[in-house]
């Protein structure tokens, strides 16, 4: 079982089958941001799609069985990490897909797909709805727990916020054994999370070790002293 990583929204006005052109991506950047926030919140809550971790949703004016269904194109044997699902929509709705007004109804379609195909007792409707609601109402202020470390009577939590510009804005908080906040600091905005690998924690300081990369220069660790 893989934790969800991303949700991507596409559109098409031709049947999405093998041999046809692939569905189009949106230039509606706000919609992409919202979909990724939803995926982040679902992942924080342990949500899994099964044996894949990217969910692609194609909004189409073509007929779809029961209006929501797995794509007729089928799974890609060379890219098993994603699956496509389709939602039938009207032409007037299709014409709004590059406007801000489409975001809420598109997220309602996303919720319907999650409920229909991925809702199990562990991921009940309330959890799915709460994650989507948090992403919509909190936006760039939504905190998603990314990493946590407990040691020496301290607890360090690294949160992520996903900004409207498509960058992550991490937040570090350190608590004592009574959950009293000892340290809170914003970390630099970033496009990638390579700088945030493991957390080392003692009574006096917290250090965030970067992920090791074979393809890029490893950034320096980030160290903060606890008051």
Indicate residue ranges for each PLM-predicted region:
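Repeated scaffold domains used in trafficking and secretory/extracellular systems
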Residues: 140-148, 189-200
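Acidic, small-residue rich beta-repeat scaffolds with periodic aromatic anchors
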Residues: 1-112, 193-227
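Short coil-to-beta-strand transition motifs
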Residues: 148-154
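Structural core positions within WD40/WD-like beta-propeller blades
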Residues: 154-158, 207
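Surface-exposed loop/turn elements that mediate protein-protein interactions on large endomembrane-trafficking
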Residues: 122-138, 170-189, 213-227
């Amino acid at each position: 079982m893989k934790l969800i990583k991303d949700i991507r929204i596409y559109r098409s006005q031709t049947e999405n089958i093998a041999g046809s052109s692939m569905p189009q991506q949106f230039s509606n950047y706000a919609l992409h941001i919202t979909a990724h926030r939803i995926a982040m919140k679902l992942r924080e809550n342990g949500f899994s799609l099964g044996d894949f971790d990217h969910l692609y949703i194609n909004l189409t004016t073509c007929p779809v069985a029961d209006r929501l269904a797995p794509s007729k194109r089928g799974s890609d044997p060379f890219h098993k990490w994603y699956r496509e699902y389709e939602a039938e929509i009207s032409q007037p709705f299709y014409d709004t897909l590059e406007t801000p007004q489409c975001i809420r109804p598109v997220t309602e379609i996303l919720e319907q797909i999650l409920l229909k195909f991925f809702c199990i007792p562990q991921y009940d409707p309330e959890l799915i709805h709460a994650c989507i609601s948090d992403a919509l109402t909190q936006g760039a202020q939504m905190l998603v727990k990314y990493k946590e470390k407990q040691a020496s009577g301290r607890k360090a939590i690294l949160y992520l916020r996903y900004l409207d510009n498509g960058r992550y804005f991490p937040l570090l908080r350190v608590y004592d054994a009574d959950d009293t906040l000892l340290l809170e600091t914003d970390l630099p905005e970033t496009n990638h999370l390579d700088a945030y690998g493991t957390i080392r924690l003692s009574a006096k300081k917290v250090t965030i070790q970067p992920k090791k990369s074979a393809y890029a220069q490893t950034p320096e660790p980030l160290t903060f002293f606890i008051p």
